[in-house]
Amino acid sequence: MNRFQVKKVAVLGAGVMGAQIAAHLVNVKVPVVLFDLPAKEGPKNSIVTRAIENLKKLKPSPLGVAADADLIGQANYEEHMEQLRDCDLIIEAIAERMDWKLDLYTRIAPFLAPHAIVASNTSGLSITKLSEALPESIKPHFCGIHFFNPPRYMALVELIATPTTEPQVLDDLEAFVTSGLGKGVVRAKDTPNFIANRIGIAGMLATMQEVENFGLTYDVVDDLTGKRLGRASSGTFRTADVVGLDTMAHVVKTLQDNLSLETDPFYESFGTPPVLKALIDAGHLGQKAKAGFFKKVGRDILRYELESGEYVPAGAKADEVYGRMLKRPAAERLKLLRNAEGPQGQFLWAILRNSFHYAAVHLASIADTARDVDQAMRWGFGMKQGPFELWQEAGWLDVAKMVQEDIDAGKALSKAPLPDWVFKGPVAEAGGVHTAQGSWNPSKGVFEARRSLPVYGRQHFPELLLGEAGPKFETAGTTIEENDAIRVWTLDGEVLIASIKTKMHAISPDVCEGLMAAIDLAEQEYQGLVVWSGDEPFSAGADLQAMLPAFMAVGVSAIEDAEGFMQQTMLRLRYANVPVVSAVRGLALGGGCELAVYSARRVVHMESYIGLVEVGVGLVPGAGGLTYIARRAAENAETSTGKDLLPFLTEGFTAAAMAKVGTSALESRKLGYVLHSDVIVPHKDELLFVAINEAKALFNGGYRAPHKRLFPVAGRDGKATILGSLVNMRDGGFISQHDFHIASLIAGVVTGGDVDPGTLVNEDYLMTLERRAFCSLIVHPKTQERILGMLNTGKPVRN
C-alpha cells in the first residue's frame, strides 16, 4: 500500500484560525496556500495578504520565524481554484455558518484530487451534515479536524469521522497530524462541540453559575482555579478573556442551538451568563479588545463588576487555607473541600463535582473512551489531569458516592444520576476507568487499549494517564550507571543515553563527571551517546548553587576549577570518537545551550528556547559559549568572504551580550545555536526516537570527530569597533555601567583579546579568556547582587 504523503495543503479561510493553521504548516515546512474571498477593492488577494501580514504582529507569535509568513501562498476563490488540484489536504476554516460551508464545498468539489482529504476545522457543527454537500466520491475522504487556538502552541487536535469516512483516511490524517504537526490527536464523536469544548465550556458555564451562588470575585476564582487546581495558570476568567468572549459566546450558542433537555440533562445550565452578555454588549470582548473580565490600565489590573458595570481594582487572592487543602493528597483534598465551611472551599468542591458529573453522564455519547476525555482536557485546556484521572486518584467509589449524594440532595446542576457503570461492573472492580488493559469504553463495556498506529512506534515514552500501563523513562531500558545527578542507560544496547536528573537539569560538577564517564563508555561499547531527559527543560544552565559552598570555603579558585571542568566536558563532547547528539526540548539556557552546541548534532523540538543568558545574573558564558561564537564566526567567514569576521561575529556577540533566547527552534537557528544540519522535530515525544536514529546514522556513515584547528579572531580592532557601539548605548542610558562592563568582557573574549586582527588561536586559548572574565565577575559586588536576586526571587536584578 502506498504511504500517504502530504506534499501540499490548502487552507480555506484567512481568518484568525485559518491564517494561524497556515502559519503552523509553514513552521513544520509543509507547503501551504491560503485562500479567501476576492477583495471587492484593490488586489483580489488583499484579504489574504492582510491576514499574512497580521501574523507577523501577533503575540505570542504563531510563526517560528516571523519572516516565514511570506512562504504562505496567497489565493482567492475566483482566480485560483486550479491550485487545489495538487493539494493532498484541504482544511476548511471559514466562519461557523453551515450554509456558507456547504456552499464552499460545492464550489471546490470539481477541483479536488481524487486522493485528497477534505477536513473542516469547525469547532462544533455536525461533520455529517457538512458532508452532505460533497459528491459521493469525496465523502469517504471527508472528516472534521478541530485545532485549538493558538494552533502552534495548543497540543490538541480533534478528528471527527462521519458514517462514510474511510477508516484509513482517519488513520493517515492522525499520523500526519501527530508526527508532521506535532499534535496530540483525540478522535471525537460527531456531537455538538465534540469533546474538549463540550466538557470545557460546560465547565466554564457551571463555574460562572457557582461564582454567583457563592458570591466570589473573578480574581479570587482565577487564583483558585489556576495552577492551584492543576489547571492553566490563567484560571477561568482570564482564560475566557484570552479565548475571546464573543468566541466563547458562539460556542455556548452552539450548545444552546443543538442540544435540548432530552439530549443533555444539563441543558438549563447553558444559558448565556448575564455577565458575559453585559461584557459583549459593551464591546468588552476580552484580551483582543483590551477589556473583558479584566482590564489593564497602566500597571494596574482591574476586574469587571456586574452590579455597577464598572472596573474596580483586582488582585485579591484566595484564602490560604484552601491553598493548603489543594496540596493535600487527592482523596483527602476532595473530602476537605466538600466539608469546608467557607464559600471558597464549597465553590471548589461544587465545580469539581460538576465536572465529574457532566463527564460521566456524557462519556458514552461524546467519546469512545475515558482516555479521549482526559487527553482532550489535558491538551486542549491545559489541565494536569483530566476529570476522570482526578476522580480515580481520589478513590473511585468514594467520590462517586459523594457526587451521587449531592445529586440526590439537589445540590448538583442536574438531577441526572451517574451511569450504572460507575457503581457496578468492571470500572467499580478496577477502581477507575484507566487500567493496565486500557481505558473504559462504556459503549462496548470493555477497557480498550490505545490505537496501535505505526506512527506511535516513534514515541518511546508517550504521555500516560493515571492508571495506564506503559514504560516510564525513569526506569526503562538497562541502567549502566546512575547517581543523584545523572542516569546513563540504553534502550537498545546500541546507543547510550545520558539523562540529567538535577533540578531543572542544571549542570553541576557531578553532571559533568557523569557525561565524561558516559562518553568513555560510549566510545568503547556503543555507536553513540544521546543526551536526553524525559521532561522539560533540556537544561536551565550551570548549577550556581552547587558552586556556592566551594566558593565560600575556598574562594574564586574553586569557581575557576569548576568552570575549567565544565569547559573540558564541552570539549570532550565535541571531540568524542562517537557522535554525541543532544535531544533538546524546552529551555536550553547558559550551560544548557553550551552543552547543546558542543554536541556533534542537535535534534531539537520545535518549542525549544535556546540562548546564552548569563548576562542576566551579571556573568559571561563560561563553559565554552563565547569560544563557540568566535569559532563559528571564523567558520562562516571562511565559507563566505574568507576575510571579514566582524559581520558574523557581531551577530553572536549581540546574542550573548543581550541574552537573546530563540523563541523557537527556528529562531534559535537564526541565532546560530541550531545549525542547518540539525534536525527539528515537531512532536516532543518523538525526540528520543529521532535522536537515537540520528546517532546511528552518523555512526554508520563513518563518523569522525572534527580536527582541532586554529582559527582567526578579530583582535583588538574588532573589539574597538564593538566597544564603540557599546559606548553609545551606555551614554544613551540604554544599558548600565555594569552592563557595559560585562559586554566589554564578552567583546574581549570573542575577538581574542589584545592581539592583531587575523591572529590564529585555538579553543583552549579562548576558554582561558572566558574563565578569567567569568571569575573576575563572580567576585564583583553588582554581579553578586544579580546572582542573589535571581536565586531568592527568580527575577533578574538590574543594576
Language-model-derived ranges and their functions:
Residues 1-529, 533-536, 543-578, 585-592, ...:
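N-terminal glycine-rich phosphate-binding loop for ADP-containing cofactors
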